[in-house]
């Protein structure tokens, strides 16, 4: 039986979306937390930008849902997010020569990567084809609009892919850059389109504990208060692509009002460790509630980009872990069974919950990239991320540009077309 035969999805009712269930899982582990004191600033940034290597064991099955934008009639059997990678030799739409905005850390060819076969694959959904990204079509849809990516460094990775794709049609103007290069604004004057990166670690307000005058890597998260770094811009946005996960793989304490209601990776008698997925669920729930209760956000479209997995093998980031594969996994190598799918399932459940509570014309949907990216261990920078001060460490969290991450924008355009 093929993977697709195993994964028939029963439909259910969502006002703007389709839902379904799957039973397949991926079984992977993360190591115990490893706190390094006195690292250089660069090493600290790398740790914070990437997935902390923490073990997360799932001891129960999860009723997993797949949420899809409601298709047009002629596409009623098209599941954009369930499929396989198939050979394709058209190559990438852009190169590291034709896109001037690729950051050094994602410019894998410039940093010495020689193999190129990882570019010769395209995502093939069940029962339909996913068109290649069309910058003209995209810019026509978002003409006169503002779109923001809300999230961490993987969200930034996503927006960097989009910038490369759009710049083949129109080169954007840098409109804003903060002192840490986290919050950015680009403007496409011909189409009057504004693109924003709104950085957030946890979606909700978080404060790092200081112990003996030093940063501890332990955070207090306040579920009653969202991160104003993104929330204060909501009223100006037409589209939001929201994501988060990697910052939660560390010791955190969840506060509601004046009470600590739960924690992650703590060992205290009077506090319950509810795990990463629970903490993420509460953060997304708070974020979606903020959007739904925004009185000046009528008509805003919110898309949740699901969890993007890492692919460390033979260790973890700090124990020699690497990601040296040069081609995708096939479906026989994927066993859906661990935390990646618990997180993804939770995210889809929360976006469905938000959609059911949608107010004042607000719309919610999903960019479900998890399945596609679980199959792409070959797409990470690995050793080719260009940091001369961290030789021996590999980036198996972010994605090369160009690379498999570009499919996220193929999917984004397909979803926007269905909404348009």
Curated annotation (Swiss-Prot):
Which residue ranges does the entry give as Lumenal-facing topology?
52-420
Question: In chain numbering, where does the motif GDS motif fall?
Answer: 151-153
Q: Which GO terms describe its biological process?
A: xylan acetylation
Disulfide linkage = 78-128, 99-164, 108-400, 323-396
Q: Which residues lie on this side of the membrane: Cytoplasmic?
A: 1-30
Q: Which UniProt keywords apply?
A: Disulfide bond, Glycoprotein, Golgi apparatus, Membrane, Signal-anchor, Transferase, Transmembrane, Transmembrane helix
Molecular function GO terms recorded: O-acetyltransferase activity; xylan O-acetyltransferase activity
Keyword Ribosomal protein attributed? no
Where does the record place it? Golgi apparatus membrane
User: Among its keywords, does the record have Transmembrane?
Assistant: yes
* Membrane topology classification: Single-pass type II membrane protein
Q: Which residues are glycosylated?
A: 96, 192, 212, 270, 324
* Sequence motif: DXXH motif, positions: 395-398
Its GO CC terms are: Golgi apparatus; Golgi membrane
Question: Which InterPro entries would you find in this protein's record?
Answer: TBL (IPR029962), TBL_C (IPR026057), TBL_N (IPR025846)
Q: Where are the transmembrane segments?
A: 31-51
Q: What is its EC number?
A: 2.3.1.-
Active site, per annotation? 153 (nucleophile), 395 (proton donor), 398 (proton acceptor)
Its annotated function is as follows: Xyloglucan acetyltransferase that catalyzes the acetylation of fucosylated Gal residues on xyloglucan side chains. Predominantly catalyze 6-O-monoacetylation of Gal residues in the Fuc-Gal-Xyl trisaccharide side chains of xyloglucan oligomers.
The family line of this record is: Belongs to the PC-esterase family. TBL subfamily.
Q: Which PANTHER family match?
A: PROTEIN TRICHOME BIREFRINGENCE-LIKE 9-RELATED, XYLOGLUCAN O-ACETYLTRANSFERASE 2
This chain belongs to the protein called: Xyloglucan O-acetyltransferase 4
Species in which this protein is naturally found: Populus trichocarpa
Organism lineage: Eukaryota, Viridiplantae, Streptophyta, Embryophyta, Tracheophyta
